[in-house]
């Protein structure tokens, strides 16, 4: 969490942006030497300098430097205030925070909320996780922290919510205070958790613990009587001093008062303790003196006024003439370096002797490395400053830097690593840049931005690079810490000059910081590296001896056993590693002599250097070394701790190769740290993958998991608030703001002037301003708006800067894929876990939010087709009748104006009375002033959220490092790129790898290698070749004259440190190796395997150099070169070699320049060249292939060969081929280089160079073809020669191609001639092309079909029996119809003839004859007869008999309703009894906005101020409230465009008609007063009709007595509703208010709806049977009731559904009492009702309710009847007939009418007595009489299997069997057990169980028990 002191308005001017200061991931030293800088000034680009700074600060700095902490991070809130003032404001903020904690919806506060950020927000808990500590930290808990690592203590305290509460107490026990000090000191000793420590110290700095408890404790020491306690005080005093030293270093300004008070008390306490005999350690007194010196120094600075903020840097003065210590040097360039051409102090890298000391060694490499990236920037800026007066500055090029003009810092953005900023620059000077390949603005590049000629400047690095954005001039930058502090005062309108240096700054930064942090004594191998002692010791871990097992390294382990002697072989395979005689043979290890020597050397020397010329197996030997070490890890590991092997490679590709080799012998415990891996095998070992594994997340310590949850929650909250404000800020750059958002920043006089419009002036024409934003009219952006007749001055009307850039042509998608150079470089730059910083938001969501925000804020948007208008869509065309070109021009003008820098000053603005009198240029200047104030205010509001998010992101980065530390500590092999090793140097210090292997060591700068090593390193193995590529340096002077390009590998070789060189090359055939030996390597022997290579096919020589003198072309951007002649030749040669049947994977094209790379790509379509690799030479070191085609590119009259003169590059280029190499270049020019001259001489001696390459045809060896240019390859079009192939194909034809070496057997050749084969006896020939397979003859011939005798045309190859006769079948089916199939087919089973049948519903319908029988047996048929029943609404039913369920459930009426709704729209829904709310877009609008809701929803009232004003009256109400001013009747004084007076009124929109020009239209009589000469008119805005004002006033204000409908007034002419007119606003608003009341009634009040919703929920819950039988429907209704925003209509639908479903459920439940045979038919009818009820509907129409009620009533009667009829078989005669007649009515398919119901009811009443519900065949009265007469309790009545009733007396339990007198079945039972076939007759007495049963014995029939008692 961030320090929570207030963010005050005062901005620090120091420390400056160019201060060395901390970068992300480090804390700078407190003591800095700034001797080069002048005294402190107010320039933000300069340093404070402290003179006479006391010396003791240096030692204290060492601990902070080693820790990598930045004491100034997060302390941005003490600016310009004393501690007392800060404390007061903190208290005020804490009060505010407590108030805010009680408020809900905190996350919805806008980003400009002034409330203090809620620091103590508790993150949500996951199930099963322990809750965060929210109570005071207890003694036991603090004691437990003392047992933990410092890192865990720091993170736990920073995450704990109880720390602040703990330190807020004003008194505590001494023992508790002492424990707190111990814990705090331990937390501050952590080396990698700087942000957590800063947070803890921030809480301590603002606590009563510091202000009250500690002083009281120190004073109490003086009077302590107990000797034992006094003797403990020195230790606690040491803790307090250490804490104070940390505190004053981090918060020098805000903590000084409390710290100085404590420091003044401590000497007195120490003297008192000393006087009482307590020993005080000398170190304690020294530390106290250091802090006293710091306090004294700070007090002096405070008196001078220079100590105002916590970002003040403590600096140390050096003795006069002393060289500035490199540890105090800033990494970034300083003000003096940029403005004064001072030569820095540099020492060359010593390559021929030893260094004076380790300090000098580190100093030398630090200065050289820093100068390598600073010098280009420094010299570039100096040249730029000298060129400022140059008129062609934008076109001028600078060698050292790239310049970007008019860069604007637009808005902050949240990323995973912190805050980044979107920066936009001018792309016009960069039209020719190909951003996909350009090295401009690559990830990690450093940029310097200034807006005042570099008097002050900001530093940033590129954090994200998308070439699509770069084309628009947009890049994301991450500013360094000092620059972040200055960003508070930067506005989006500020224009910067941005300068880029090409160096990968992030790599420099990490290494430079590492060199500053490392202590001299911690540099390993100093005796060899610094003192250059040639004696190399054995590794320390082998001092006690070491026995190694080499068995896994051997292909045949038995050889190992043979090589050991006697008993030794029997005991174990381990041997003494120092006794080379015991080692396995080189043959057993598969090594040559030099490789064997290298392996022995590497395993026995602590510093092993292995040089491997090309092809000698460097990587192979390196893997053998790693395998040996891993196999014998017990020798160099400690049992209690794991130390991984660290493998460092220069490139990602080399790292992948090496780790894949290790994977062959080690499948687990590998970790890869570097750029994105292209290896599928290694992806599982990347940090990202390992970190995301579930098992790893589970094993993370709890304190890290808690911290992660807390920080993620806070990050999300800060991000949300920041994004809202940032989007607002960005919107201001994309259009013109609406005036209401600027009102706060416009003076009252200017606002009134702006909104009133211009006074009468002949130069103005009139429009209707109410339709548009007034500010658009004022800025000249309205089309029919106030437009000055005179053209404005300035570039507004010119085409300057308005031309649109032409888009570059698209790349062809059919070309081979070549990684863009920018991508290649970036891939090596980006550490995988660092990743390119991308905004956290998804673009889709971002765009949606931005669009909504822009719509609200902007009156005109640059990304919109039509400028913003508040008018409805109907008026859009009429209002903006501008041509497309004019709109485009208008947008360009706005774009230009928004990017202009000239702004009106406030003083100038105050002198303006009428803003409409300004010319257009001045208006834009004034607008930019208002805009700047708006932007500044918005920027100020989001600043605190930036700081909060940045702090949380830094805390999160620390947590990630802790996670990574856990991963790396568990690994056995850690692979890193050099950049990754520098970045993770602090973790490597913790991991402490004992063995470090550096691959490609000769390519790595020495400083990079040293920064990789930790003091724990005991074994360093360097593998490389200094005669190939050297390390690359930016500055040529430093590389050559200061030996910066000499790697540690090369330097150690040159100072005679022992090394082993691999002597046998296993790659190149001898002819190719001859180019390297002896020209580059004196003695490089060929391994026998390279003597067995086959000759290259199709070429007379395996090695050849083609000479030419065709000139190169220089590529403007990128300083690269290309040679079209060479590119065409190489591509043609490549295609020729493919024709020789070489695989694409066997050929690689190399070139020396990137420009040539993309020239080649354009010539290589993927169809032909898929799989061919194309690379630049530098990216191909370490690689090899069978055939290499090399293009050297350079060819010019000046003889410039560029880096082709560098031996190392020549070595790499000539050593990549295994079997064949073909090179093309200007050899005459290259021969001027001595090395090339010698190589060319060797080539000439062997006839391997010449102007033409001799091709040799494989098929005709005597035929040779000379090729010197691409067109010559046309002589060998198919890769052979020009002779025809003449091969006779299997088909008998001749091959039509030219001679071709591929496909010699012609198996793949496709002969395209017509096939001539005879297919049948009739002589028919094959119609196919020759290569196609012949098919059976398909020529049709007449044949007689044997089965039927018909004559048919049958394919020649088909027999008569197989052919299906195509004649119609003549057979007659059983139904009498003819068979419809063909003669050859089986006859149809079901006749398809259509016949008419009568359906069950009574209708006739055509059906298939074959289905008639099935229909008789119940097959359902959908009757399509139209229903045509007249519905309740009067319209005919649109359904069919089937869809209307045979008239029982009619379909909804589909006729249009056409009724007029209250909103004046016609109902769009089909005919219903009750119209639903209108679903069209609401048409209500005002001058400010338009309602976007549905018309039937309640409108949100406009709360903007009412704009109805004129010179005489002004309304002061809100827009939605009734106006409080009268209408004005003063005639309008404006002139129309025609020059005649306006016929309108003051303050009203001027009517478009003229009394003079259109007299007929104006004076046309409507109300009767239009022809009067003084008549005044009003134009309705909704329809544009004009009316005489007095008549229209009466019309609008009259209220007819007989008018009962609530509706809007309409235009008397066209009946369009009058919705928008300021003059009649009160009347319109009154009508709208009435309409809103009606809407609310329709929708229902929220309270009523909520109550009804709860009641329905309770009702639904009570319907248990419904839930049980119909769970799906129950759940649907339950979910519906859980929804929000339900209307009354919705609830009505749900209520009806519940009641209907409940009734149906009851009916379904009653079916148990119905005979089984009858249940299915009823269930079918119930399912039909359910099916119909489940249809989607907004409500039930009256017709639907009627149908549903009728059907449910029918089913209720039917179920009741069937229940009565369960025993109906006993009912005889007339009763059975009566039952049958009732069932006929109830089971018919037509609707159950009212008459049916009356008849059924009457018949059912008659049956009650004869057919009771009991089913006993007796009436209920008779049943009651029988039960009463027997006098037995419930549960005594039973029935036999056939349902005959009998009674068991006494206890009710069956004690004997008998027979039923009716049916002779067994009744009764024995031993109180009833016969299984008998059952309880509950219908007699309602009993639920027998009287004698377990249930009865436990519970009995409760009513019976009650009666018996």
Swiss-Prot record:
SMART domains tied to this protein: ZnF_NFX (SM00438)
Region (Disordered) spans which residues?
1-133, 787-813
Query: What induces this protein's gene, according to its Swiss-Prot or TrEMBL record?
Result: By interferons (IFNs). Expression is induced upon viral infection.
Polar residues: bias regions: 113-122
What the entry lists under PROSITE patterns is as follows: ZF_RZ
Give the residue range of the signal peptide.
none
Q: Which residues bind Zn(2+)?
A: 1840, 1844, 1860, 1863
Segments forming NF-X1-type zinc fingers: 1291-1313, 1375-1393, 1433-1455, 1463-1480
Q: Name one GO biological process term.
A: activation of innate immune response
Where is this protein chiefly located? mitochondrion
User: Does the keyword section mention RNA-binding?
Assistant: yes
> What is an example of a GO molecular function annotated in this UniProt entry?
helicase activity
Which keywords are on file for this protein?
Antiviral defense, Coiled coil, Cytoplasm, Immunity, Innate immunity, Membrane, Metal-binding, Mitochondrion, Mitochondrion outer membrane, Repeat, RNA-binding, Zinc, Zinc-finger
SUPFAM superfamilies in the cross-refs: P-loop containing nucleoside triphosphate hydrolases
Q: Any phenotype upon disruption? A: Mice are viable without obvious physiological or behavioral abnormalities. They however display impaired innate immune responses against RNA virus infection by producing less type I interferons (IFNs).
Cellular component per GO?
cytoplasmic stress granule; mitochondrial outer membrane; nucleus
Point out the coiled-coil segments of this chain. 939-964, 1733-1764
A Pfam match is ZnF_RZ-type
Q: Where is the composition biased (Basic and acidic residues)?
A: 1-12, 76-107
Compositionally biased tracts (Acidic residues): 802-813
- Report the subcellular localization: Mitochondrion outer membrane; Cytoplasm, Stress granule
Q: What ranges of residues constitute the RZ-type zinc fingers?
A: 1818-1889
Assembly information from the UniProt record? Interacts with MAVS.
Q: Which family does it belong to?
A: Belongs to the ZNFX1 family.
**What's its job?**
RNA-binding protein that initiates the antiviral response and is required to restrict the replication of RNA viruses. Acts as a double-stranded RNA (dsRNA) sensor that recognizes viral RNA and then interacts with MAVS to initiate the type I interferon response. Also required for immunity against some bacteria, such as mycobacteria.
The protein, known as = NFX1-type zinc finger-containing protein 1
Q: What is the lineage of its organism?
A: Eukaryota, Metazoa, Chordata, Craniata, Vertebrata
Query: Its encoding gene is what?
Result: Znfx1
């Amino acid at each position: 969490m961030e320090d929570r002191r207030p963010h005050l308005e005062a901005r620090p001017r120091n420390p400056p942006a160019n201060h060395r200061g901390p970068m992300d991931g480090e804390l700078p030293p407190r003591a800095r030497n700034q001797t080069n800088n002048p005294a402190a000034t107010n320039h933000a680009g300069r340093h404070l300098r402290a003179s006479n700074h006391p010396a003791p600060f240096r030692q204290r700095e060492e601990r902070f430097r080693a820790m990598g902490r930045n004491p100034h991070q997060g302390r941005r809130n003490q600016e310009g205030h004393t501690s007392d003032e800060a404390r007061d404001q903190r208290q005020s903020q804490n009060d505010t925070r407590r108030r805010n904690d009680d408020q809900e919806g905190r996350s919805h506060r806008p980003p400009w909320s002034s409330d203090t950020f809620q620091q103590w927000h508790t993150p949500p808990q996951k199930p099963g996780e322990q809750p965060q500590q929210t109570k005071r930290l207890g003694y036991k808990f603090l004691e437990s922290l003392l047992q933990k690592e410092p890192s865990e203590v720091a993170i736990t305290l920073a995450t704990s919510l109880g720390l602040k509460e703990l330190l807020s107490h004003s008194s505590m026990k001494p023992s508790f205070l002492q424990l707190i000090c111990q814990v705090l000191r331990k937390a501050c000793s952590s080396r990698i958790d700087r942000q957590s420590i800063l947070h803890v110290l921030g809480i301590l700095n603002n606590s009563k613990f510091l202000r009250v408890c500690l002083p009281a404790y120190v004073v109490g020491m003086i009077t302590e009587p107990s000797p034992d306690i006094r003797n403990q005080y020195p230790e606690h005093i040491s803790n307090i001093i250490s804490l104070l030293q940390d505190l004053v270093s981090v918060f020098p300004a805000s903590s000084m008062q409390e710290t100085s008070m404590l420091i003044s008390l401590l000497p007195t306490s120490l003297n008192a303790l000393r006087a009482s005999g307590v020993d005080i350690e000398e170190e304690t007194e020294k530390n106290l003196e250091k802090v006293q010196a710091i306090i004294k120094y700070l007090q002096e600075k405070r008196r001078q006024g220079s100590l105002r903020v916590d970002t003040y840097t403590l600096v140390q003065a050096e003795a006069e003439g002393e060289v500035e210590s490199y540890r105090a040097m800033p990494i970034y360039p300083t003000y003096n370096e940029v403005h004064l051409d001072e030569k820095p102090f540099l020492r060359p890298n010593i390559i021929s002797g030893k260094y004076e000391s380790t300090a000098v060694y580190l100093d030398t490499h630090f200065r050289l490395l820093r100068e390598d990236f600073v010098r280009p920037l420094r010299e570039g800026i100096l040249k730029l400053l000298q060129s400022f007066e140059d008129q062609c500055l934008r076109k001028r090029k600078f060698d050292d830097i790239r310049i970007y003009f008019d860069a604007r810092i637009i808005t902050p953005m949240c990323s995973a690593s912190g805050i980044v900023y979107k920066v936009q620059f001018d792309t016009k000077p960069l039209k020719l840049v190909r951003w996909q390949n350009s090295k401009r603005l690559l990830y990690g590049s450093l940029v310097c931005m200034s807006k005042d000629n570099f008097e002050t400047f900001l530093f940033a690095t590129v954090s994200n690079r998308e070439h699509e954005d770069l084309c628009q001039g947009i890049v994301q930058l991450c500013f360094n810490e000092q620059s972040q502090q200055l960003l508070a005062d930067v506005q989006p309108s500020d224009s910067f000059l941005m300068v880029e240096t090409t160096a990968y700054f992030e790599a420099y930064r990490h290494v430079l910081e590492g060199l500053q942090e490392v202590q001299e004594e911690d540099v390993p191998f100093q005796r060899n590296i610094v003192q250059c002692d040639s004696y190399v010791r054995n590794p320390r871990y082998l001092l006690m001896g070491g026995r190694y097992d080499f068995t896994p390294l051997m292909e045949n382990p038995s050889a190992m056993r043979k090589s050991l002697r006697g008993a030794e072989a029997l005991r174990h395979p381990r041997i003494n590693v120092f006794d080379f005689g015991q080692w396995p043979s080189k043959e057993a290890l598969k090594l040559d002599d030099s490789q064997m020597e290298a392996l022995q050397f590497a395993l026995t020397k602590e510093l092993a250097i292995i040089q491997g010329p090309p092809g000698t197996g460097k990587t192979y030997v390196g893997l053998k070394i790693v395998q040996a070490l891993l196999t014998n890890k017990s020798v160099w590991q400690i049992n209690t701790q794991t130390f991984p092997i660290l493998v460092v490679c220069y490139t990602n590709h080399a790292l992948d190769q090496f780790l894949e080799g290790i994977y062959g012998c080690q499948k687990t415990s590998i970790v890869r740290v570097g750029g994105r891996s292209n290896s599928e095998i290694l992806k599982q070992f990347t940090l990202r993958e390992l970190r995301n594994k579930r098992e790893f997340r589970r094993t993370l310590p709890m304190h890290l998991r808690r911290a992660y949850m807390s920080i993620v929650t806070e990050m999300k909250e800060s991000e949300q608030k920041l994004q809202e404000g940032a989007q607002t800020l960005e919107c201001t750059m994309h259009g013109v703001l609406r005036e209401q958002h600027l009102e706060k920043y416009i003076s009252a006089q200017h606002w009134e002037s702006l909104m009133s419009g211009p006074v009468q002036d002949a130069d103005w024409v009139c429009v209707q301003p109410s339709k548009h934003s007034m500010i658009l009219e004022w800025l000249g952006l309205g089309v029919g708006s106030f437009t000055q007749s005179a053209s404005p001055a300035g570039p507004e009307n010119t085409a300057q800067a308005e031309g649109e850039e032409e888009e570059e042509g698209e790349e062809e998608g059919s070309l081979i894929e070549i990684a863009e150079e920018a991508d290649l470089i970036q891939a090596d730059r980006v550490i995988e876990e660092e990743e390119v910083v991308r905004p956290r938001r998804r673009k889709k969501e971002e765009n949606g939010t931005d669009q909504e925000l822009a719509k609200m804020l902007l009156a005109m948007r640059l990304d919109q087709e039509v400028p913003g208008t508040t008018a409805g869509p109907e008026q859009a065309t009429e209002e903006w009748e501008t041509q497309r070109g004019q709109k485009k021009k208008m947008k360009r003008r706005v774009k230009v104006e928004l990017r202009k820098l000239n702004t009106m000053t406030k003083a100038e603005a105050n002198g303006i009375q009428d803003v409409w009198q300004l010319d257009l240029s001045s208006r834009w200047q004034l607008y930019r002033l208002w805009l700047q104030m708006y932007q500044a205010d918005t920027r100020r509001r989001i600043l605190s959220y930036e700081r909060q998010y940045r702090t949380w992101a830094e805390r999160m980065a620390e947590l990630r490092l802790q996670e990574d530390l856990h991963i790396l500590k568990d690994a056995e092999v850690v692979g890193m790129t050099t950049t990754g090793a520098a970045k993770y140097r602090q973790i490597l210090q913790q991991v402490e790898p004992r063995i470090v292997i550096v691959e490609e060591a000769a390519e790595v700068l020495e400083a990079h290698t040293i920064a990789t090593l930790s003091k724990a390193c005991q074994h360093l193995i360097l593998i490389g070749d200094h005669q190939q590529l050297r390390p690359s340096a930016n500055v040529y002077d430093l590389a050559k004259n200061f030996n910066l390009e000499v790697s540690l590998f090369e330097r150690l070789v040159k100072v005679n440190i022992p090394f082993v060189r691999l002597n046998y090359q296993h790659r190149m055939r001898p002819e190719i190796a001859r180019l390297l030996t002896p020209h580059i390597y004196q003695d490089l022997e060929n391994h026998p395997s390279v003597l067995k290579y086959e000759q290259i096919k199709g070429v007379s020589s395996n090695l050849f150099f083609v000479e030419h003198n065709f000139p190169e072309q220089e590529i403007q951007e990128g300083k690269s070169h290309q040679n079209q002649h060479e590119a065409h030749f190489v591509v043609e040669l490549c295609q020729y070699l493919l024709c020789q049947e070489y695989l694409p994977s066997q050929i690689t094209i190399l070139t020396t320049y990137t420009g040539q790379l993309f020239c080649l790509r354009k010539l290589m379509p993927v169809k032909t060249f898929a799989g061919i690799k194309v690379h630049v030479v530098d990216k191909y070191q370490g690689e090899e292939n069978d055939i290499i085609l090399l293009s050297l590119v350079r060819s010019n009259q000046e003889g410039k060969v560029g880096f082709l003169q560098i031996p190392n590059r020549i070595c790499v280029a000539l050593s990549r081929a295994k079997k064949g190499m073909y090179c093309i270049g200007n050899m005459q020019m290259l021969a001027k280089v001595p090395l090339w001259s010698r190589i060319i001489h060797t080539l000439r001696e062997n006839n391997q160079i010449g102007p033409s390459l001799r091709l040799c045809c494989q098929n005709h060896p005597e035929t040779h073809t000379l090729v010197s240019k691409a067109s010559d390859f046309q002589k060998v079009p198919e890769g052979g020669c020009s002779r025809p192939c003449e091969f006779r194909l299997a088909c008998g034809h001749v091959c039509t191609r030219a001679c071709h070496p591929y496909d010699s057997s012609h198996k793949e050749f496709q002969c395209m001639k017509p096939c001539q084969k005879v297919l049948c006896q009739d002589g028919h020939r094959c119609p196919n092309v020759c290569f196609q397979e012949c098919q059976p003859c398909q020529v049709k011939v007449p044949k007689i079909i044997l089965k039927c005798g018909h004559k048919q045309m049958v394919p020649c190859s088909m027999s008569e029996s197989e052919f299906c006769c195509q004649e119609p079948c003549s057979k007659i089916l059983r139904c009498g119809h003819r068979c419809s199939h063909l003669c050859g087919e089986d006859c149809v089973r079901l006749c398809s003839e259509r016949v008419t049948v009568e359906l069950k519903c009574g209708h006739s319908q055509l059906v298939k004859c074959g289905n008639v029988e099935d229909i008789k047996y119940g097959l359902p048929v959908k009757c399509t007869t139209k229903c045509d029943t007249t519905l309740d609404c009067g319209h005919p039913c649109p359904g069919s008999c089937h869809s209307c369920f045979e008239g029982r459930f009619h379909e909804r009426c589909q006729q249009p309703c056409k009724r007029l709704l209250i909103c004046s729209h016609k109902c769009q829904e089909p005919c219903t009894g009750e119209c639903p709310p209108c679903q069209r877009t609401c048409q209500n609008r005002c001058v400010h906005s338009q309602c976007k809701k549905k018309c039937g929803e309640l409108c949100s009232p406009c709360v903007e101020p009412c704009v109805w004003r004129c010179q005489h009256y002004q309304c002061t109400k809100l827009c939605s409230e009734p106006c409080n001013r009268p209408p004005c009747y003063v005639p309008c004084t404006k002139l129309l465009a025609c020059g005649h007076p306006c016929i309108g009124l003051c303050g009203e929109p001027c009517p478009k008609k003229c009394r003079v020009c259109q007299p007929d239209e104006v004076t046309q009589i409507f109300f009767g007063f239009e022809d009067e000469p003084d008549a005044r008119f009003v134009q309705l805005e909704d329809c544009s009709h004009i009316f005489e004002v007095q008549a229209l006033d009466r019309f609008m204000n009259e209220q007819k007595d007989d008018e009962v409908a609530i509706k809007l007034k309409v235009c008397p002419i066209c009946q369009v509703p009058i919705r928008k007119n300021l003059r009649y606003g009160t009347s319109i608003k009154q009508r709208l208010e009435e309409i809103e009341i009606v809407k609310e009634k329709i929708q229902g009040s929220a309270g009523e709806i909520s109550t009804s919703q709860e009641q329905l929920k309770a009702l639904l819950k009570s319907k248990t049977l419904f839930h049980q039988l119909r769970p799906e429907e129950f759940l649907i209704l339950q979910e519906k009731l859980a929804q929000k925003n339900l209307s009354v209509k919705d609830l009505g639908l749900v209520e009806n559904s519940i009641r209907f479903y409940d009734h149906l459920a009851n009916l379904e439940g009653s079916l148990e009492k119905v005979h089984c045979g009858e249940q299915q038919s009823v269930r079918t009818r119930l399912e039909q009702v359910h099916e119909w009820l489940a249809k989607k509907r907004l409500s039930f129409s009256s017709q639907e309710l009627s149908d549903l009620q009728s059907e449910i009533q029918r089913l209720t009667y039917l179920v009741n009847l069937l229940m009565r009829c369960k025993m109906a078989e006993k009912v005889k005669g007339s009763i059975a007939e009566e039952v049958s007649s009732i069932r006929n009515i109830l089971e018919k398919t037509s609707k159950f009418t009212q008459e049916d119901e009356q008849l059924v009811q009457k018949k059912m009443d008659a049956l009650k007595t004869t057919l009771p519900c009991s089913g006993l065949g007796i009436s209920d009265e008779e049943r009651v009489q029988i039960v009463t007469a027997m006098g037995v309790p419930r549960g005594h009545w039973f029935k036999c299997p056939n349902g005959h009733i009998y009674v068991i007396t006494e206890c009710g339990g069956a004690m004997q069997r008998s027979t039923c007198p009716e049916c002779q079945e067994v009744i009764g039972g024995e031993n109180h057990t009833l016969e299984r076939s008998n059952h309880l007759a509950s219908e007699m007495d309602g009993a639920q169980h027998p009287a004698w049963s377990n249930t009865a014995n436990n519970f009995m029939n409760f009513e019976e028990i009650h009666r018996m008692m």
